[in-house]
A protein has these predicted regions:
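Dinucleotide-binding Rossmann-like beta1-alpha1 core, especially the glycine-rich loop
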Residues: 46-130
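Active-site substrate-recognition segment that forms the wall
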Residues: 15-23, 48-49, 84-86, 200, ...
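Short hydrophobic core segments
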Residues: 5-7, 196-207, 337
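N-terminal Rossmann-like FAD-binding beta1-loop-alpha1 element of flavoenzymes
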Residues: 2-28
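Helix-loop-beta segment of a Rossmann-like dinucleotide-binding subdomain
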Residues: 82-96, 108, 118-161, 261-265, ...
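C-terminal catalytic lobe of FAD-dependent flavoproteins
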Residues: 293-356
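Glycine-rich FAD pyrophosphate-binding loop
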Residues: 22-42
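Helical element adjacent to the flavin cofactor pocket in flavoenzyme catalytic cores
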Residues: 141-200, 204
């Protein structure tokens, strides 16, 4: 049996550990976060699985990789002990009258990037049938029927409980840099044995890997979570706006996660007043029922990004780094982990050869 050491327990650390165990391997996790994962970007994310709408503002590869990830979510989630909220109700892209030019620009880009059957333009009657409450404020929309989202809190809890049962999961201080020497010292001090016990090490630290990935940077995102008993939106919604295009993802029990901001900053301070006002104003403009919603959380985090905004898997002398998921953790995480597992399966039984 191969034995892997996972450094980090955010979304990618959890996915990697879970899939390695399901493949029949042993896993040890070392992480500076708590087991609930409350300090990870994936814990506060909207967790939309939106290969088509994301590709429109990125490139075709996001669509193609995202479709592969979506198939993996379909396959993997039923393996958990309890169901995870995973509505496959699509995404509606809308704009207010003054921002119709933004929607038209988005549609032209979609026609260039996507296939014709990836989305459809719907009129007021079709929107009324699909989402009556959204039709109260909008007369048309672009509909992406194959998109979805999942409840990241449920997922974190379910996978966290699984990993607690099936791994040796230790909490440690943050590690600034990974080398054979620092890993050997870490193993001796924390686990009481040599690094050589492990087939390979997988670095899943996200922003924690900055000292080792010189081109990695953090991109700040700000997210609200609200309880809105007067709102019954079933689809994910994207609101076009020239400064802060907003996305909204439903959760069980009339909860919604709302985000918009992509700020080139590594500031982890609380949500700014300006961002909160813009988010709440845009939210109210989508549905008047949000006027009486209760704000449950305002959170900010920094998502790890590389210059091309695409994820990477890099081999090191001690193992692999998987990083740079940017705002696409839930969209591209599964396919990246699947690629990593393929690389690991191609290793010889001796695994990565540690330098002396």
């Amino acid at each position: 049996m191969k034995h892997y050491l996972i450094i980090g327990s955010g979304l990618i650390g959890r996915l990697t550990s879970w899939r390695l165990i399901q493949a029949g391997h042993a896993v040890t996790i070392l992480s500076s976060d708590d087991k609930a994962g409350t300090d990870s970007a994936g814990f506060i994310a909207a967790s939309m699985i939106a290969p088509f709408t994301e590709a429109v503002t990125a490139d075709r590869s996001i669509r193609d990789l995202g479709i592969q990830s979506q198939a993996l979510w379909d396959k993997w989630l039923p393996e958990l002990d309890k169901p995870v909220f995973y509505p496959k109700t699509g995404t509606l892209v809308v704009a207010h009258e003054g921002d119709k030019a933004e929607l038209a620009r988005y549609q032209r880009r979609a026609a260039h990037i996507l296939d014709a059957d990836d989305y459809q333009k719907i009129d007021a009657k079709q929107l009324q049938n699909l989402s009556p409450e959204l039709a109260e404020n909008f007369q048309s929309a672009l509909y992406f029927p194959e998109e979805s989202c999942l409840d990241n809190r449920q997922f974190y809890q379910q996978v966290g409980e699984f990993l607690t049962k099936h791994t040796n999961w230790q909490t440690i201080e943050p590690i600034e840099t990974l080398t054979n020497a620092t890993l050997e010292q870490l193993c001796q001090q924390t686990l009481g044995h040599s690094l050589n016990k492990f087939t390979s090490v997988i670095d899943c630290r996200g922003n924690g890997s900055k000292a080792d990935l010189k081109d990695l940077r953090g991109v700040r995102g700000e997210v609200l979570r609200v309880y809105a008993p007067e709102v019954n939106l079933q689809q994910c919604v994207r609101l076009m706006h020239p400064r802060y295009p907003l996305y909204l993802a439903p959760r069980p029990d009339h909860q919604y996660v709302i985000g918009a901001t992509v700020i080139e900053s590594e500031d982890r301070s609380p949500v700014s007043v300006r961002s909160a006002m813009e988010l709440l104003s845009a939210l109210y403009s989508i549905h008047r029922g949000f006027a009486e919603a209760r704000v449950l959380e305002m959170r900010a985090h920094c998502r790890p990004a590389l210059p091309d905004h695409l994820p990477t898997i890099r081999q090191q002398e001690w193992g692999y780094q998987i990083n740079g998921l940017y705002r696409h953790g839930y969209l591209l995480g599964p396919v990246m982990v699947e690629q990593l597992l393929t690389k690991l399966s191609e290793q010889t039984d001796s695994g990565v050869r540690y330098a002396s």
